[in-house]
Amino acid sequence: PEHEEYYRDQNLSESLKAIYDHRCQVCGMNFKIKYDEPFAETHHINPLSQGGADISKNIIVICPNHHRIIHKTNAEFDCTKLLYRYPNGYEERLVLADHFEQKSSWG
């Protein structure tokens, strides 16, 4: 299958990582503290490939482990409860959600 490219705003991604100091919004893991190296990824809640927007309200900062398991299991995000629901019924609430609660219109 052909791989389609989607525009991603790297400044937005880096800004969100800075807000959370590179901590995973799901588990709070901070590689910078443990390994002296900032290491986090950003994940689109609604995938760009399915019409999701590259805006702050559609992006979370996440550790590589959570990024992989969310994709592998196709976990669903509950926007009202700010949690991921996995196919086996397990639910994991975001421990960090500052940018969802801001009344800002950036991104």
Where are these regions (language model features)?
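Conserved hydrophobic/aromatic pocket- or pore-lining residues that grip, position, or stack substrates
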Residues: 16, 24, 67
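Append "and, occasionally, other polyanion-binding protein interfaces
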Residues: 11, 22-25, 40-43
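A detector for short metal-coordination/catalytic motifs
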Residues: 7, 32, 37-107
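A generic local structural motif
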Residues: 10-12, 27, 49-50
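Short, flexible, mixed-charge glycine/proline-rich loop motifs
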Residues: 12-20, 52-56
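Short, well-ordered alpha-helical segments in soluble proteins
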Residues: 20-23, 31
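A short mid-domain helix/strand-loop element embedded in enzyme catalytic domains
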Residues: 1-9, 13, 33-34
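Short cysteine-rich clusters marking metal-coordination/redox-active sites
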Residues: 24-27, 63
